[in-house]
Amino acid sequence: MAIEVFSFFSGLGFMDLGFEEAGFDIAFVNEYNHSFIQAYQYARRNRPHRPQYGYYEGSIEEFLDDRVWNQRFPDYDVRNKDRIIGFIGGPPCPDFSTAGKNAGSTGKNGKLTEKYVKLIVKRQPDFFVLENVKGLYQTKKHKIFYEQMKKRLYRAGYSLFDSIENALEYGVPQFRDRLILVGFNRRRFGKNLRYTIGTNKTYEMDRIKMCNWPTVEPFQIGIVRNEPQDIIPELTVEYWFRHNNVENHANSRDYFNTVANNKFVSIAEGDTSKKSFKRLHRWRYSPTAAYGNNEVHLHPYQPRRISIAEALSIQSLPVWFEVLPTLSLSAKFKMVGNGVPYLLANGIAMELQGWIEEHMD
């Protein structure tokens, strides 16, 4: 039995893919940005499954209207013990990010988190997943808002579980903390529930930190550096570049051909200390893939920025995943950087799938 998932703020669909590969059925896709919808469909053009309720380009707020909702999903409330529906979504998060605008719940993007919560409360899915930046949980003024949202969800009948998860622990070659909030409808699953986020990790952070990761070495075009001892190769940029055959990927030439910049050759391999112009080290993991807002990541041993193919590998996407070629480079990098790392999403989905199967009526 495939569990139906309604995806909101879908973007390129990295999170959706993680759930699909865990056995969930993506039944509906909602995204506000036209280019994102196009790119979502393009990346899946060779996959046979199409969402049962299709794709919808528009605001999540529209689905708070009963007329719109019932017209789109006439059988949504027709439930039996074998039909389970969940919502997944990562509302745009720069208003809660310490590296972003920090406008909080009153910001344009910050308000979308509340709208997602309102939709969950009103439509009562059997479960939901909310993904966001850790700033929503750890920054004092944002956490007040976050706790208010949790109270609203609890009063609406949900048992809640949350955790800050790092993508590295799921096999992603990138240090990226994310807030994961999972809710189960008590009317469906009962009270006194127990659930632990993070049971499907590949590596523990303590082990990762104990590795002898290389730091900074002089940059030289095309220089060969052998794999160091006492690291986890599968968490390195170089491993994923090779794994995804990035030089022959469809998006391998998608990088900014800017006029020669001294920074392209002067910044050492592994120097990620600056706010912008961070050069990745081939035998280490990447910092958070936040492309945009003047955040520039440089190739470890080439005098250029990284390509879209390389960015996709750093987000742990499968080698077949491609970004629509007709989009602007800026749009492509924004899409890739905004996505939930695929292996992180898949790990969360796998443990959720197992829990639901164990707790079916």
Summary of predicted features, one role per range:
Residues 6-61:
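SAM cofactor-binding core of SAM-dependent methyltransferases
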Residues 89, 130, 291:
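Redox-cofactor binding/interface segments in oxidoreductases and associated redox assembly factors
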Residues 66-83, 93-274:
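Class I S-adenosyl-L-methionine
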Residues 234-361:
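C-terminal target-recognition/interaction regions appended to catalytic cores
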Residues 1-5:
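Extreme N-terminal starter segment of soluble prokaryotic enzymes
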Residues 43-62, 68-86:
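Short, structured active-site "lid" loops
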